[in-house]
Amino acid sequence: MRFPPLLFFQDSEAVKRIANSVRGTKDDDAEIKDHSMRFIRNAISGDQQKEILNVDMLRYIAWVLVALNENIVTARTVIRERDAVEDALKNQQPEDIENFADDLKINMKYNRDLERFEIGVFDFVKYASRVTGSQYRLSNQSVIKGIVYCQKDVAIKILRESFVSNMFKVIDSIDQTTASPVLSDQTDSINELREFYKKSVYAKLTIGRGNTKAFPPCMKEIIRNLHEGINVPHMGRLAIASFLHKVGYTEDEIVEYFRNAPDFDESITRYQIKHLSGEISGVEYSPPKCETMRSNHLCFMDDDKLCHQDWMKHPLTYYEVKSRRLG
């Protein structure tokens, strides 16, 4: 398993050749095209089957994502392959892991005497901060003279996050005004993907018993960030989950709002929802009050007049008042 250099991904002629391929002529190119489009479509629908793509498919997919220009589709597609990469690395020998790390520009070596992987502290901190779990924190590793000594599972998480970072660098390096002409023969297929995305994702986000027009600005902003695949801090996730529960959303409906989170794990999400709803803990949690939202940089009142009322102390109060005003 290898990760090509940036120049490989920027080969527009190779991408155009694949885009223009027809079944029965260059079957390899046609298969790359068809398989890549299926992979993106399956990522949109939430298919979690793990599959390692070859480098030609990875390149073609990057160009299609740029032409499509839908953040959630990009995030879902990259995350789907990220999970496959992580799974594959678990079965790789140390030297193969070293080679993959080298492709990602990470200096990672396996110390056979200690049976640990060595990683520079800068790279470790950069990528470990994106992984959930205390076992991935620097404070729980052995660090000697700027070198982190970690177990294989921790090293794999570092490479997983580096893979994501490198994929987004690839995607950012491709100009959309270039991608669309290169993929002009695939315009209809790309538009079909866009329509499929809108139907499958937007439809789910409008499900629920709460009146979204009455949601306070803070909750709308958290939802927008989740919708766009932006990493929302723990307090923000707790706030929106407890808020949605309080205004009548079911567990399944709340889960859909979190599905685009970069580190989404359905089983963990469901457990946390059950906990805050009182099903597990026996205590039903309420969203944080406005003061707590402000202290955690989660208040986005801007010029909303209702937010600026002296008596406005809680997001649920906002929702109740706004709902009455909307009738």
Swiss-Prot record:
InterPro entries: DNA_primase_lsu_euk/arc, DNA_primase_lsu_PriL. [4Fe-4S] cluster binds at C218, C290, C299, C307. Binds 1 [4Fe-4S] cluster. This is DNA primase large subunit PriL. Pfam families: DNA_primase_lrg. The gene is priL. One of its GO terms (biological process) is DNA replication, synthesis of primer. Regulatory subunit of DNA primase, an RNA polymerase that catalyzes the synthesis of short RNA molecules used as primers for DNA polymerase during DNA replication. Stabilizes and modulates the activity of the small subunit, increasing the rate of DNA synthesis, and conferring RNA synthesis capability. The DNA polymerase activity may enable DNA primase to also catalyze primer extension after primer synthesis. May also play a role in DNA repair. It comes from Thermoplasma volcanium (strain ATCC 51530 / DSM 4299 / JCM 9571 / NBRC 15438 / GSS1). It comes from the Archaea. Transmembrane segments: none annotated. Its cofactor is [4Fe-4S] cluster. Keywords: 4Fe-4S, DNA replication, Iron, Iron-sulfur, Metal-binding, Primosome. GO terms for cellular component: primosome complex. NCBIfam families: PRK02249.1-3. Signal peptide: none annotated.
